[in-house]
Curated annotation (Swiss-Prot):
The gene is nadK. This is NAD kinase. It comes from Archaeoglobus fulgidus (strain ATCC 49558 / DSM 4304 / JCM 9628 / NBRC 100126 / VC-16). Belongs to the NAD kinase family. Its cofactor is a divalent metal cation. Homotetramer. One of its GO terms (biological process) is NADP biosynthetic process. Involved in the regulation of the intracellular balance between NAD(H) and NADP(H), and is a key enzyme in the biosynthesis of NADP. Catalyzes specifically the phosphorylation on 2'-hydroxyl of the adenosine moiety of NAD to yield NADP. Signal peptide: none annotated. GO terms for cellular component: cytoplasm. Keywords: ATP-binding, Cytoplasm, Kinase, NAD, NADP, Nucleotide-binding, Transferase.
Length: 249
């Protein structure tokens, strides 16, 4: 087997490389994500959740990812630098995976998002008028600083800071939530990921997972992609979710 190790800082890379070689895995190191990662049997990400999101932005077909958390919360990761060897050995030997949906956005056809698509005002501190449609049905029109269309995985990201609910990672859904809405009592919507979401706004930018962005005026469509993010199975993912959420901040 061949593994790509993608690292933000190289403090633990030597140990990870040696551990993989003991498992008879060929290793190639990358200090930046690359489209080449699609050609490997699996990927080891060394960093935080942001490192994994940057890796995913480069991939359409996604080999299984094993995350070693050197960041803060590490909701997407499997192990820490202190305990990764046991967990990595177990993952490689069992090779059980789990898939989480990513979403596509018509404004950025070459980019897929795992966490969210955010629509923001192009001008800082200036509100925009947003219209929201679900399967062609207008749900609302609202003035706000922006609007987030998040996945269940993204419920603990930007949507969380905007007041959205925490959703368990295996419940596939869209969370629709405005940023700083100019209205009393606005509540998020949670809808099936089989729905088609349309957001209409002017003088806006659209951002995928806090990484890539483009300007747009008019309408964008957000839908579930046929290319999921693939991770090694993490049996503690649900069990650890709420403790990690409590640790945020």
């Amino acid at each position: 087997m061949r593994a790509a190790v993608v690292y933000k800082t190289d403090g633990h890379v030597k140990r990870i490389e040696e551990a993989l070689k003991r498992l008879e895995v060929e290793v190639e190191l990358f200090n930046q994500p690359s489209e080449e990662l699609e050609n490997f049997d699996f990927i080891v990400s060394v960093g935080g959740d942001g490192t994994i999101l940057r890796i995913l932005q480069k991939l359409k077909r996604c080999p299984p990812i094993f995350g070693i958390n050197t960041g803060r919360v590490g909701l997407l990761t499997h192990a820490s630098p202190e305990n990764f060897e046991v967990e990595l050995k177990k993952a490689v030997e069992k090779f059980e995976v789990e898939r989480f949906p990513r979403v596509s956005c018509s404004a950025m056809p070459d980019v897929l998002a795992l966490n969210e698509i955010a629509v923001l005002s192009r001008k800082p501190a200036k509100m925009i008028d947003v219209a929201l449609r679900v399967d062609g049905v207008e749900v609302d029109r609202i003035r706000c600083d922006g609007f987030i269309v998040a996945t269940q995985i993204g419920s603990t990201g930007y949507a969380f800071s905007a007041g959205g609910p925490v959703v368990e990672p295996y419940l596939e859904c869209f969370i629709l939530i405005p940023i700083a809405p100019f209205r009393f009592g606005w509540k998020p919507y949670v809808v099936s990921m089989e729905r088609k979401i349309e957001v209409i706004a002017e003088k806006a930018i659209v951002v995928a997972d806090g990484q890539k962005s483009v300007d747009f005026d008019g309408e964008i469509t957000i839908e579930k992609s046929e290319f999921p993010a693939v991770f090694f199975k993490n049996e503690k993912r649900f069990r650890n979710l709420f403790g990690k959420v409590r640790s945020i901040g």
